[in-house]
């Protein structure tokens, strides 16, 4: 008997359009698997209203024709469309960035008591926050590039002091990032003090906390990880960027892989770097209490050859050019099998949590 799966995509997020592309890929795979009854839920970018669609269209323009049935949720009671209850066995969120990767939707699904694909509340919330993620990884002696972080209110009160810290502790050039955002949105490289204020202000347009890191010329390595208690680390891949300073939003989603961008799977690594990447991927996954899946990004300095953990993505891209599925496929796990495995992991994680915690014993 087929399981009822709810695929949630879109979202009130700067990465809304990327989510649509990822959802289309996953939906197509679910149809090929023919193991699940798929309920496609589109979350409007402006209103945040949830709509039940007949399918996941291949383009954003087609969605508007189908957004008629509004989805309502009542924790403890169920999910409803047109006053009819939907019996959902598992939820697959593919909302990138805010509300999707920050623990919000994970908390909601937990309240609904439904298995959920991917990381839980804690792992999601920490991983998406670049500042706290780096602080935590550094505390476990996992190498990260030198950085400082600050909130908007603190910057307003002590702008010159923070700019002085950037100059003294990091030295230029530096890379300026919104703390909670993905897909390289709002990220800029500042080469001198005259640029830093402009880029900090731009980053604050996306988030209330900004992270400034020492910019290094680096190789960009990505590593796919799946699993719960037992994890599998796939062969790392490398993104070789020719015409961009780093792998920014335009490079990721506005450029067709070719001369400007080359995906090398496997990445050309010496044995030490390969082993270190797999070790740090394992430790990062463990310390952040991740489950389901993650893409862990690394930097290898072209000057010093030193390795750093850069960022952690708990809902990596599933578009036709995304590295996560490509790395899995290189090691023999097809796109469809990957999607199916992630759903299985969601059921396993849910069952373990339910078996481990017996709330009835607290009753008097």
Swiss-Prot record:
Any one GO CC term of the record: cytosol
Location(s) in or outside the cell: Cytoplasm
Record: residues binding Mg(2+) 1: 297, 311
Domain ATP-grasp: 134-344
Location (main, coarse): cytoplasm
Keyword Membrane appears in the UniProt entry: no
Known catalytic reactions: 2 D-alanine + ATP = D-alanyl-D-alanine + ADP + phosphate + H(+)
Enzyme class: ligase
UniProt: Mg(2+) 2 binding residues: 311, 313
Pathway field: Cell wall biogenesis; peptidoglycan biosynthesis
Pfam families hit by this protein: Dala_Dala_lig_C (PF07478), Dala_Dala_lig_N (PF01820)
Binding positions (ATP): 167-222
Keywords: ATP-binding, Cell shape, Cell wall biogenesis/degradation, Cytoplasm, Ligase, Magnesium, Manganese, Metal-binding, Nucleotide-binding, Peptidoglycan synthesis
Annotated NCBIfam families: D_ala_D_alaTIGR, PRK01966.1-4, PRK14570.1
Protein name (record): D-alanine--D-alanine ligase
Primary gene name: ddl
